Amino acid sequence: MNGLNALNMRQEPKRGAKLAEKLKCEKSSIHYLSILNGNTRGLVWTDDPTAPRLAVVYSYLLGGFQIMGTPLQTAEEYAAFRLFFENKVFPLAKDEFELSEFAYSADTEALSDMMRVVFFDKELFEQKQLVYRTAEEYSAAEMPFIHAAEGRPMRIRRASESFLRENAEFAGAYLPEILESYKSFADFLKHGFAFFVLEGENICGNIISNGEYNGCCIVGADTKAEYRRRGIASALLRTAIEFARERGNEIIWECAEENIPSVRTAESCGMHRCGEFFVRWFEFEPNTPQD
């Protein structure tokens, strides 16, 4: 293989278990494996749909990219890969997805080193992410106490068709986020789950799964600012752990190393740290006005 034809990255519309199996490694992100598997929405480019050596995976939910596979070998391949980003990925990211920066992670250190060479002229920023997993020795524990205001009890409710009909805030504020990862709400209920803490009908906090692969579910949680420091996130995470365990699944929790409350939430629910990775990004240069 010579010249720019040494690497022909193309969009891969047909995703499935075989593609995920061929590209995964020990440190692969569950969220991006779920995209490769076809359970979660995203875009995939590979160098070869039948025997992929390299893949670039885009997440609609995260607005970021994952680099998977094995590193490039030749200068021609590096040049072709950079042109692939310049000619295909960057215009799509800026014009269609309206992104102001290009953010990515890589499955391995070798791929991270490769990307530094590919973007040798970019000013890269980075943030360390920690990965937590349900501990094997985890056992059901008493549900953490939620510190509700006097006379304003809180309850936890699972997302369902009836919840969608009954709670306008869920339908208006949270359903759109879910549909960034799943093609329909029915598809979400088939492959994912969500729990919400309610004060009356007001949603105080949530935990939503955004990918599943090989029995592992990755979740993201958020608590409204005025309800923080009340044990809501821990209660939601423990609820998700119990829900997953009943179905023979495990929970994956990712957070920035500097996000101490999120780290403490994972540890308070008996999760153990099983890995780490870096998110790196650079800002797009503003478009030059055309005469």
Task: Please report, for each region that a protein language model flagged, where it lies by residue.
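Short amphipathic alpha-helix that is part of the acyltransferase structural core
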Residues: 1-28, 134-183
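Acyl-donor-binding surface of acyltransferase catalytic domains
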Residues: 41-43, 48, 52-164
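Glycine-rich acetyl-CoA-binding "A-motif" of GNAT/NAT acetyltransferases
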Residues: 51-53, 202-205, 261
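Conserved acetyl-CoA-binding loop-helix of GNAT-fold acetyltransferases
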Residues: 75-88, 229-242, 264, 268
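Conserved active-site alpha-helix within GNAT-family acetyltransferase domains
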Residues: 109-123, 234, 257-275
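Terminal substrate-recognition subdomain of acyl/acetyltransferases
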Residues: 133-144, 268, 272, 276-291
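A conserved beta-strand-loop-helix scaffold within acyl/acetyltransferase catalytic domains
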Residues: 181-216, 220-224
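Conserved hydrophobic beta-strand within the GNAT/NAT acetyltransferase core sheet
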Residues: 221, 251-255
